[in-house]
A protein has these predicted regions:
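Membrane-embedded helix-loop-helix hairpins and adjacent transmembrane boundary segments
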Residues: 2-487
């Protein structure tokens, strides 16, 4: 019977991938002529509100929200659901703090990547090289882990062997990102956001039904372990320091993540931002609450999972009819794909704009070469990631731990202070980046938890301090000339 079941599961998945390809081809056809870099990496700055909200949410919500998060909720109970809700202001914070100023400056400097912004603001080559390298290293770690997550998911739910799953996954993402660019990435994010929303709601209803209603489900949880329904969670894991760290890492710190930040450069007008903030926050709320609650209540349906991470895929196959499970399986796949495509684009933009064009500025006019390079680099990066995920070395898992927090530690202050503090200069920004990055790497590697805080907290604080001290020694930045080619 498993054969029948898995073919029913795979059909919707294939259909879904086809739709994704269709959208990419559409994005390719819609490309505006001229200003290639601006179009490929930013979709010519033309996003409206709904699309902006969806792309931010879909980029922000990755495999972890569909796999790791609910897994933790399964293990620690309803308290974790509450903890997950701290993430709510993420959209509002990144659009509110960065959004407007960022977009205005980006248009003024004609910036395409985050590093363009940093260069225009601090006028330091060294800074841009450092930023580019840390970005590439971190993204390679983060993307590989997402790939692994995607393949594991297919393995559990549809019984597709790990290697096959990896190939299906990697090839389709690399292709559509390479050919469609930012526009394809954003359109697909919008589609993926919709799929995630519908999927979450359907699954939650299915679980509550299978557990025999909400009251019954909570009673079952209490019978398993009374702490599952207490605010502190099982093993009393949710202490105030833990909560603070979690908030800094996944909510406040998100402002510093390059692939979220770049979404702030690419919208149309203020109306789009205001709409984006409202819609985005609602979508994040529904998704976060839905997925984590599903994980926590899932314990009442399947009490004896050994690997909590598999709670969602297992529930899907158990609670939903095969065809519906297939559609829903597309949701976490969507989450993973939208996160990877954003990071892939960001990496290839970094290589081309910040490393290659910095060395050979005369190539800017050479549209054809840039087009080929962008596509080729995106594909090559995709291939490298596949290799890394094929036999995941221990290093990779460690890299990913570093990736998220490390990026925040490196980028957060130079970005925010660059926008809001007139006197910020290159010396300050460099010292902040080096202190933040190195400190985070050291603390995370040796698992040092100062006063029980996650390494991100001391790293950000000291990085801020380093910025202020370093700033004393630097020269003020000369006001850059207005470089403006587009409107």
């Amino acid at each position: 019977s498993s054969d029948v079941c898995s073919s029913d599961l795979i059909l919707p998945l294939v259909a879904y991938l086809l739709v994704v390809f269709g959208l990419s081809i559409y994005a390719m056809r819609k490309r505006t002529t001229g200003a290639f870099l601006n179009e490929y990496f930013l979709g010519s700055r033309s996003m409206g509100g709904v699309v902006l909200a969806m792309t931010l949410t879909a980029t922000y919500i990755s495999a972890s929200s569909f796999i790791g998060g609910p897994g933790a909720a399964y293990k620690y109970g309803l308290g974790w659901v509450l903890l997950a809700m701290i993430q709510l202001p993420a959209v509002w914070l990144s659009l509110g703090i960065l959004g407007k100023k960022f977009a205005i400056l980006a248009r003024r400097y004609n910036a395409v990547t985050l590093n363009d912004m940093l260069f225009a603001r601090y006028q330091s080559r060294l800074l841009v090289w450092l930023a580019s390298l840390s970005l590439l290293v971190a993204f390679i770690g983060a993307m590989t882990v997402q790939f692994i997550g995607g393949a594991r998911l297919l393995e559990t739910a549809a019984g597709i062997p790990y290697e096959t799953g990896l190939i299906i996954f990697g090839v389709s993402i690399a292709l559509y990102t390479a050919f469609g660019g930012f526009r394809a990435s954003v359109l697909n994010d919008t589609l993926q956001g919709m799929v995630m929303l519908i999927g979450t709601i359907v699954l939650l209803v299915g679980i509550v039904h299978a557990a025999g209603g909400l009251t019954h489900a909570v009673e079952t949880l209490e019978a398993i372990d009374p702490k599952l329904v207490s605010p502190q969670g099982a093993d009393d894991i949710l202490s105030p320091t833990f909560m603070t760290s979690f908030w800094v890492l996944v909510c406040f710190g998100v402002i510093g993540l390059p692939h979220t930040a770049v979404r702030c450069i690419s919208y149309k007008d203020s109306k789009a931002v205001h709409k984006g903030i409202i819609i985005g926050t609602i979508v994040v709320a529904v998704l976060m609450f839905g997925m984590h609650l599903a994980g926590a209540l899932g314990r009442a349906v399947i009490p004896d999972l050994t690997v909590p991470d598999l709670v969602i895929p297992t529930l899907m196959v158990k609670v939903l009819p095969p065809f519906a499970a297939g559609i829903f399986l597309a949701a976490p796949m969507a989450a993973i794909m939208s996160t990877i495509n954003a990071q892939l684009l960001q990496s290839s933009a970094t290589i081309i704009k910040d490393l290659y064009l910095n060395l050979r500025p005369e190539q800017v006019e050479n549209e054809r070469r840039l087009k080929h390079m962008s596509a080729v680099i995106t594909l090559v990066l995709g291939a490298l990631l596949l290799l890394a995920a094929w036999r995941p070395p221990e290093m990779i898992i460690w890299l990913n731990l570093l990736a998220f927090g490390g990026l925040e530690a490196v980028f957060l202050w130079p970005l925010v202070l660059g926008l809001y503090w007139e006197r910020a200069n290159a010396a300050g920004a460099l010292s902040a980046m080096i202190v933040g990055g190195v400190l985070y790497a050291v603390l995370a590697t040796f698992k040092i938890q100062y006063l029980g805080f996650h390494p991100i907290v001391p790293s950000l604080l000291l990085s801020l301090l380093a910025f202020v001290v370093g700033n004393r020694f630097g020269q003020p930045v000369p006001q850059p000339a207005m470089i403006s080619t587009d409107k």
